[in-house]
């Protein structure tokens, strides 16, 4: 079926199971927002007072739900205002996809009104960033962005979409998105070595990180700590992997420690 680039963005979001996006509209993103209104029965848009707030809200949503957070903004300051949110998600390994508007492709690189090279600006604080210059490439780029955000060490990915790309039409074919790969034990022998080390430890202590929470393994981790009767200290990202009032929990350590 023939769809505009803006409609393709919405269809790709639905493919990925997205039901909530955070953002702040502007001129270069109006086509996308017009399409988003047509999809409002399936995709909820939460308007924030500032783009930075939208990026942090998408980050928090991803942490709370385990889903990939999505933030939408316009070009120029709309795009640069989300850099701090992207950096936060990058450092903490939070899956996030940012979709930004930009000036039309014929105006790129001409110092146009509210034009910045956001793709290169965010490279140090994202897993990847893409500029889509043809509507035919849009769907595959968004799908790739979600795959990158969700696979391996999770993190933010930015897709920059010029205004004419969101207005142009092309054929769209729905696909079943690739699901994140499950973890595999690739070296059972090393696991057995670790088991022996834990078994023979005289005073074992566990330093727990955020991977436990992102893997939704808090209950299993608590059972493991109780089984070997080891006190648990946490990194900043690991806080919450075991209840703070649990007898084995000794809280955070280091300069941010509370014990």
Predicted regions and their residues:
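N-terminal alpha/beta PP-like core and its mobile active-site loop of ThDP/TPP-dependent enzymes
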Residues: 1-259
């Amino acid at each position: 079926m023939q769809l505009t680039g803006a409609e393709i963005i919405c269809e790709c979001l639905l493919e990925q199971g997205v039901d909530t996006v955070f953002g702040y509209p502007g001129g270069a993103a109006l086509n996308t927002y017009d399409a988003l209104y047509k999809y409002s029965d399936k995709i909820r848009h939460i308007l924030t007072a500032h783009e930075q707030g939208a990026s942090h809200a998408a980050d928090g949503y991803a942490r709370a739900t385990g889903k990939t957070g999505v933030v939408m903004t316009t070009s120029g300051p709309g795009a640069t205002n989300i850099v701090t949110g992207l950096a936060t998600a990058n450092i903490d390994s939070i899956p996030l996809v940012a979709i930004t508007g930009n000036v039309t492709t014929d105006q790129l690189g001409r110092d146009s009104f509210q034009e910045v090279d956001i793709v290169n600006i965010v490279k140090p604080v994202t897993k990847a960033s893409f500029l889509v210059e043809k509507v035919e490439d849009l769907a595959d780029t968004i799908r790739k962005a979600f795959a990158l955000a969700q696979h391996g060490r999770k993190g933010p990915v930015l897709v920059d979409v010029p205004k004419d790309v969101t207005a142009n039409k092309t054929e769209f074919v729905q696909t079943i998105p690739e699901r994140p790969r499950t973890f595999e034990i690739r070296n059972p022998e090393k696991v057995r070595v670790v088991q022996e080390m834990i078994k023979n430890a005289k005073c074992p202590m566990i330093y727990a990180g955020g991977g436990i929470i992102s893997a939704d393994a808090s209950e299993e981790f608590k059972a493991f700590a109780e089984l070997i009767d080891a006190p648990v200290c946490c990194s900043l990202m690991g806080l919450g992997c075991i209840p703070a009032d649990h007898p084995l929990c000794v809280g955070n350590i280091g300069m941010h420690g509370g014990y």
